[in-house]
Each structure stands twice: as C-alpha cells, then as structure tokens.
Amino acid sequence: MSQAQYAGTGRRKNAVARVRLVPGTGKITVNKKDVEEYIPHADLRLVINQPFAVTSTAGSYDVFVNVVGGGYAGQAGAIRHGIARALLQVDPDFRDSLKRAGLLTRDSRKVERKKPGLKKARKASQFSKR
C-alpha cells in the first residue's frame, strides 16, 4: 500500500511550509485543518491553488502542509512555493510552465528593520533647516 509521495519546502517572508503531495482527490490540509478553515480569505486560497492551475493537475493530489511563522499572506505564499517544488518531483516537465508563471522563484522580500533615531524603517521626523 505504499503510495508515491512528493515533498517540497516553500518559504515566503517569515513563513516556512513543508508540503507533501499524495495522489488523491484534491483535498488540502494545513496544520491538520481543512484549508477553508485554516485560511479564511478566498483570494489566498486561490494563491495556494495556482501551481495546480498552471500544470492542469487540479484535483489529482491530496496536499498535506505543515506551516509555521508569518501571517496568512506569507503562509499562503510559502504553501504555493512548496506545492510548486513538489510538483517538480512529480514531473520535471512542469519546470518550464511553473518557472514562466514565477512559482519556483523564492520571493526574497522581507520586512526591513527599524533603524534607531527613525520612527519606522525609513520614516524620519520632519527636517527643519533652521
């Protein structure tokens, strides 16, 4: 009863998602909860399903995700990245379409740190010449 399993790790902002793909019906489970329950925003659920839409594999794999860190948007991006990487293991021919859609590229943008003497990362108090 050993089924083929495909794994991928995705990252976005401060979120890290470990993704497992198992041939199945298309059910997505995030941290042992259904995806509709875990991620309340419909637009973020669309983000998660992008790799399946690009490769026309929607509904053919069950997805099991363990995600930590970040907020809803960062976690959704990390899950998307992990699913795209796992789909590469399913079929290496998916690389071209996933790369063209920008799903394999790690989005390296992070929150810039606050600097001392400034109000935020770049916001300074108003400058007075005299």
Swiss-Prot record:
Compositional bias of kind Basic residues: 111-130
Gene Ontology BP annotations: translation
Annotated region (Disordered), positions in chain: 107-130
InterPro entries named in the record: Ribosomal_Su5_D2-typ_SF, Ribosomal_uS9, Ribosomal_uS9_bac/plastid, Ribosomal_uS9_CS, Ribsml_uS5_D2-typ_fold_subgr
Pfam families: Ribosomal_S9
Keyword Ribosomal protein (UniProt): yes
GO molecular function, one term: RNA binding
GO CC terms: cytosolic small ribosomal subunit
Family as reported in the entry's similarity comment: Belongs to the universal ribosomal protein uS9 family.
PANTHER family per record: RIBOSOMAL PROTEIN S9, SMALL RIBOSOMAL SUBUNIT PROTEIN US9M
Name by which UniProt lists this protein: Small ribosomal subunit protein uS9
Lineage: Bacteria, Bacillati, Bacillota, Bacilli, Lactobacillales
